[in-house]
């Protein structure tokens, strides 16, 4: 059985089922709770039945993944709850642990967050260096839109803002999907 050792949001049950089944298709799993459910110390997530060698072979990977995923889902859910009633979403980052990005981003979704970008290829992000090199925000956005059109690419544009004036400039531009606020203090984010 998988015994829950802390309160939080459980994550990684579907992954655990895949691992156990991959190691031994004869393993039987009785699932009692699902990914995203709130759990408390002492809850049982599932029972596993099968050859002890197969269970032990999969056990450490399952436990490590579920601990990490549940921690991420729990932390994400804490912030999601704080923002209930607003239009604000919790987004994850592309900066993840090498080799387990998919699991970490899956955990964010389980916790109620939204995936930002999976990799460099799925959105265009204009950072401060790009903006400076292009000669300003408006020029950077216009050049990016032209490039996307010329190359028949359907990618969303995200622009990083360093201050409130840059946000105002970005908001006047057409075609920006998201604004990334960089190192803003709490008071500035409320503005």
Predicted feature locations:
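Short glycine/threonine-rich loop/turn motifs
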Residues: 171, 180-191
């Amino acid at each position: 059985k998988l015994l829950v050792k802390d309160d939080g949001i459980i994550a990684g049950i579907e992954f655990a089922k895949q691992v156990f089944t991959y190691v031994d298709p004869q393993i039987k799993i009785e699932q009692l709770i699902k990914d995203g459910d709130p759990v408390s110390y002492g809850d049982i997530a599932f029972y596993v039945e099968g050859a002890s060698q197969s269970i032990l072979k999969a056990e450490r990977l399952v436990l490590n993944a579920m601990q990490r995923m549940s921690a991420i889902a729990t932390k994400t859910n804490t912030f999601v709850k704080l923002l209930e009633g607003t239009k604000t979403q919790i987004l994850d980052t592309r900066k993840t642990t090498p080799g387990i990005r998919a699991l970490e981003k899956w955990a964010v979704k389980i916790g109620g967050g939204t995936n930002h970008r999976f990799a460099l290829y799925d959105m265009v992000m204009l950072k401060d260096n790009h903006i400076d090199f292009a000669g300003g925000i408006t020029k950077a956005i216009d050049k990016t839109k032209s490039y996307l059109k010329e190359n028949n690419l359907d990618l969303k544009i995200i622009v990083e803002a360093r201050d409130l004036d840059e946000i105002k400039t970005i908001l006047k531009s057409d075609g920006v999907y998201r604004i990334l606020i960089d190192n803003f203090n709490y008071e500035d984010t409320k503005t």
